[in-house]
Amino acid sequence: MQFRKSLLCSRISLILATGALLSSLANTALSQQSASDSGQWTCRADASGAWQCGENPTAARSTVSAGVVVTRAARDVSTARSGSSAAVQANTTGSAGAVNDWVPVEQMTPEQRANVPANCCGAFIEPSRTGLDGQVLDPAADPAGAPTLFTTPGAIEQGTDERVSIAGAVSIQQGNRTIRNSDSTQIDQQADTITLSGNVEFREPGVLLTGSGAFVDQANSQNRIDNASYVLHQYGVHGAASVIVYVSEGEVLAIENGEFSRCEPGNEFWTLQSRRMRLDTAAGIGTAEGVTLRIKDVPVFHYPFTVPFPLGDQRVSGFLAPSVGSTSDGGVDVALPYYLNLAPHYDATLTPRLIGDRGAMVSGEFRYLADWSMNTVSTSLLPGDKRFDAATASVPGSDSPAREDRWFVGVQHAGQLGERWSTAINYEAVSDDRYFRDLGSSGLTVSSRTHLQRNGQLNYRAPNWYAGTRVQRIDIIDPYVSASDLNIPYDRLPEFTFGATESLGGLQLKVDGSHVRFDRSLNRAGLTPAQMAAGALVQGDRLHVEPEISWPIRGEAGFIVPTAGYRYTQWSLDQQAVGTLQDPDRGLGLFSLDSGLVFERSMARGNGFIQTLEPRLFYLYSEQEDQSLLPTFDSAQINFNYGQLFRSDRFSGHDRIGDADQLSLALSTRFISGSGEERARLSIGQIIHFEDRIVALDSPLQNWLTLQPRNTDRSALVGEAFYLLSEQWRLNSDLQWNEDQQHVDESSMSLRYQGDENHIFNVGYRFRRVVELYGPVPAGLDPRIKQSDVSGVWPLNNNWRLLGRWHYDHSNSRNLDTFAGVEYSNCCATIRLVAREWIDDDEFFLLQDDTNTGVFFQLTLNGLGNVSGGGISRMLSDGILGFKEYGTNE
């Protein structure tokens, strides 16, 4: 909407014309003391600019044609002087029962109801409006420059040459702008003002203003409405005020002693009351001075100064809603963020925070958006943590942090230079290992972080080749891992990657490679001579190049893809193991043949369903070479599953390349509906080994995990299943069956129901027999994974719903994360109450769990933000698959 000039202040409007209408009223047929009380005056300018006015009986009908009014009445048409101004009646068509354009859901059309969240009982819907000609008013019709028309059924009286009074209702139209009143209108030419009384209504697209009276001061370009109310349809807000002043030079409402709310009219859950309020509808920003927040008409918060707030999604400087919580670990936790909208492309947030059992903390975040990058800098400082205990600070598992002063620094950067260059930086540092567990998220989300990523990347990608470089350091912040632990990962200082692809007819050529410098700083004091002799301190460079050629042949009935490749690796080592080479290298050939067929059949009673049968064979041969004396910088055993049947290596990284002479047998069947949707899938497969596997990792435990199946001639039987029971129900499952031991090695199952965003039910179970542990298993602790996870959201009605999660470790009889809560929500506010029990350190080798409990409350006022406990939303979205805020229509 464009309020370049108010209707009431426009120089071409009837009321504010520079004397033209007043002169015509004084010198034409209207000079008689009053017009007939039984008629209706309707005027419109003709092609020459003269006004054609007629007195119409109220029972008569009139038609507008080509700039003149044709009256089906017995009276003559009087002509006003050229240059005078007039208006026509603007008919309004709205929904039955609508009050100030608020339409209850029951009275909406199906199309309107589809755009309203389920928890809302109605919405502000702007009615369609028609002019005198019966045509719907064009919302884009600019009032400035549009002809001004008016109509009145009342009497027009002239007191003096400068003053005119109109008794009765007056309706004015100028473009898409209309104004009406019911009682009387006084025009003062000398003062250039107009006074209207009796049910004044002012409309433009997206704006409705009503009041008991209005005063227009053209000299100051202001329109004043008394005892007023307003509706801004675009933002879904409304309110009332003793006075509203509309400034014609901009889309601004100045409100005195007014209210602001997004709730249902007459049933406001919350309102903002203010001495003075300014709503800039063009910018989407409001400001209020002397603000009182009222909940159900009870004042709960007062701010005596000026506070900005958004009308929509705009960013505005000012205090954000506070966050309030309480946990057994930190006590009462209160944070009050202050947002600084410094410029359109950068901003900052400063958050003072008080933790009852720890002390005062301050955090800051600065965000900068450049033409080619997004950048964020975050910092936090808690000086003098009151839970610090010097006597126990160095004891693993102690409640005391390792340091008295706690801090955090983080930098994130993501850039895109043109279409081919990209950059990324991620840097984090903390004062101690328990920082995130104690302070990371106010107790509302699990923060058991054990690693900090520090990396920077620069990449270039062309259509047929790529190159990149990165540096990476992973810091361990696990209090149970020492600085001499051999499982501390290596740093990449730096790493270069490259690759290219090319097509020659049907042949596909590809090469990938990398060069990495691996470095690691271990505490020598914690290492034994045997460990150092075995290469615990080894570091160095590694070059890996992998050319490959393939000839894919694909068709509707199947495919066959033969591939041949060579993998060459060279190391340059320092402090390598005793008796090993300083510059070893390795070159291994590879051949694979991947093939599959697709059979289809129509199901006799399948209502258009098609069933497929898809056998697949994957043969892999990889040369064997003794690699036991090579370092393991980044290699690890990949967990075996159905997808692993078709991989060319059972290890990740390039320090180990698995030897193989094997054939993978797989069979899948799919059920596809007539619309092409996959409704079910079942796959099963196994690897047949023609030779024993020799290559293993160095870790004794990982060697045991690897060697366990290496002498068998068959792998475990693996399968996966998917079944779409209906549009709402979905079942997924996978299984790994050990034929030799006749037991399940690993399995998982999940069943999910989602009718919509407000009807969610998830249940899952995960089992794994062998877990990779880097230390002895304590007596009485079951290292197997046996976990169930149940979560859901279920509404009791359109406003109330239950939500919760139960994540349980059956191996050791403990809750990993359990919460239950209730929520009330409408289109005005959301209230949540959640009780939670969780553990931060859920590593399986811990004898004692660090259990936390808490009760959290959240009140969200739509349009104002979270009044308390804002982190609950993240906790729910992390814990309940598919969770969304109540009422979202996405």
Region annotations inferred by a language model:
Residues 169, 275-276:
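Conserved beta-strand and immediately adjacent loop positions that scaffold enzyme active sites
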Residues 33-248, 336, 340, 379, ...:
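Post-signal-peptide, soluble extracytosolic/periplasmic N-terminal scaffold domains
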Residues 21, 172-175, 516, 520:
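Short helix-loop boundary/capping segments at the starts of domains
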Residues 2-30:
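Gram-negative bacterial Sec-dependent N-terminal signal peptides
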Residues 97-101, 105-111, 116-130, 155, ...:
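Outer-membrane beta-barrel proteins and related beta-barrel translocases across Gram-negative bacteria
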Residues 8, 15, 65, 76-79, ...:
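General helical structural elements
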